[in-house]
């Protein structure tokens, strides 16, 4: 554990010498509390911007079965934005199916022309060269019957594409719930067994059914879940890998949780609920029963007490809002069981309570809860030297 001074100048100096993906939760919370989320991220943005020249890092970003929402989220990032990240880190985004012009020229079943005009040849050349970071967005169908032919791109199944891309990758990052563990496409249904959609390293919570395992490829994967994922989670993770802040595979056991998620963004022992902007209403036992209110959203199906992510600290849309702040109950889209574990999305989970207590009991002891909350906030203020 790293002890830190609460003085801002000393804190910034301390942060400059730290690897943020290796911070424990206490250190991370102290840093964010002292600097604020925007300033905290800005500290690392400055580190990136002022870094020495790097050798070019190639990134190959491939898409399976998905809605491209995670790419859109990353493109909307602002601290740093995608252009800053690519430019300052000297990243060559060699392939991205949404951003690159797609062409496939075939003649009698054979690829023809050059990599400049044929994206299929470009990918094959990149795979052979190796030395790249592979980003995977979207799930991978294994069906029907293990063939993977429910998703074919350029006369090749995406299952084959993933296998070819993963073999020579220096690092593999799964972006979004679908790539991490199947997501929406692997939701329980009458056809799920036939389609058999999987994540790169997991199928829901089962690591034995990840697609790399199916392909016989033994490589670690960094999972950045969410539906969509937060742009900071993606860009800061890629930045940490490129800058050498996290060594693969040596540092991964300490930096990642049991599902391959960076602990600094997805803390195992803390939840979205703890830093929810509506938390005060929960402490007082005040709950909305209809949409459009301003109180706690638990009775409208909010899953924040079970969602392990830093949304309440980081916020979205330029660090100004988040789902619950905007009036939408958290659906715990970062969980390996999503979406099935979150269903029904907008109905109170009557068989569950928050921290082991029935929610109606919480309401009956609202005065006591408020007192406890006041004490917690007082301790936090003392910890910041206020």
UniProtKB/Swiss-Prot annotation:
Please tell me whether the keyword Signal is annotated for this protein. Answer: yes
Record localization: Cell membrane
| EC top class, as a word | oxidoreductase
| EC nos | 1.12.98.3
Q: Which InterPro entries match?
A: Cytochrome-c3_hydrogenase_C, NADH_UbQ_OxRdtase-like_20kDa, NiFe-Hase_small_C_sf, NiFe_Hase_small_N_sf, NiFe_hydrogenase_ssu, TAT_signal, TAT_signal_bac_arc
Keyword annotations for this protein?
3Fe-4S, 4Fe-4S, Cell membrane, Iron, Iron-sulfur, Membrane, Metal-binding, Methanogenesis, Oxidoreductase, Signal
Residues the record lists as binding [4Fe-4S] cluster 1: 67, 70, 178, 227
- What is the induction comment? Expressed in methanol-grown cells.
- List the molecular function annotations (GO) for this entry: 3 iron, 4 sulfur cluster binding; 4 iron, 4 sulfur cluster binding; electron transfer activity; ferredoxin hydrogenase activity; metal ion binding
Give the range the annotation lists for the signal sequence: 1-51
User: What protein am I looking at?
Assistant: F420 non-reducing hydrogenase I small subunit
User: From which organism does this entry originate?
Assistant: Methanosarcina mazei (strain ATCC BAA-159 / DSM 3647 / Goe1 / Go1 / JCM 11833 / OCM 88)
């Amino acid at each position: 554990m790293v002890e830190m001074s609460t003085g801002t100048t000393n804190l910034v100096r301390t942060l400059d010498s730290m690897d943020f993906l290796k911070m424990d939760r206490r250190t991370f919370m102290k840093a964010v509390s002292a600097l604020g989320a925007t300033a905290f991220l800005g500290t690392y943005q400055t580190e990136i911007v002022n870094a020495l020249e790097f050798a070019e890092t190639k990134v190959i970003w491939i898409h399976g079965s998905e809605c491209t929402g995670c790419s859109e989220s990353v493109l909307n990032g602002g601290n740093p934005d995608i252009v800053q990240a690519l430019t300052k880190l000297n990243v060559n985004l060699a392939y991205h199916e949404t951003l690159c012009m797609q062409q496939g020229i075939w003649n009698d079943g054979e690829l023809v022309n050059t990599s400049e005009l044929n994206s299929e040849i470009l990918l094959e050349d990149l795979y052979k060269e190796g030395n790249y970071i592979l980003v995977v967005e979207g799930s991978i169908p294994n069906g029907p019957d293990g063939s993977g032919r429910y998703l074919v791109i350029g006369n090749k199944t995406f299952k084959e594409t993933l296998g070819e891309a993963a073999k020579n990758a220096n690092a593999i990052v799964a972006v979004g719930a679908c790539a991490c563990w199947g997501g929406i496409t692997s939701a329980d249904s009458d056809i799920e067994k036939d389609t058999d959609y999987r994540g790169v390293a997991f199928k829901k919570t089962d690591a034995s059914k990840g697609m790399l395992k199916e392909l016989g490829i033994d490589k670690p994967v960094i999972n950045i879940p969410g539906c969509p994922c937060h742009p900071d989670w993606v860009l800061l993770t890629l930045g940490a890998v490129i800058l050498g802040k996290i060594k693969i595979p040596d540092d991964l056991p300490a930096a990642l949780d049991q599902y391959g998620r960076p602990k600094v963004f997805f803390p195992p022992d803390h939840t979205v609920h703890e830093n929810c902007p509506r938390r005060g209403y929960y402490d007082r036992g005040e709950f909305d029963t209809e949409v459009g209110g301003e109180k706690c959203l638990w009775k409208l199906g909010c899953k924040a007490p079970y969602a392990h992510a830093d949304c309440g600290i980081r916020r979205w849309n330029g660090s100004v809002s988040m789902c619950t702040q905007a009036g939408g109950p958290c659906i715990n889209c970062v969980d390996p069981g999503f979406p099935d574990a979150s269903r029904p999305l907008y109905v109170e989970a009557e068989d569950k309570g928050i921290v082991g207590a029935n929610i109606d009991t919480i309401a009956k002891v609202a005065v006591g809860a408020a007192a406890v909350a006041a004490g917690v906030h007082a301790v936090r203020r003392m910890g910041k030297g206020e």
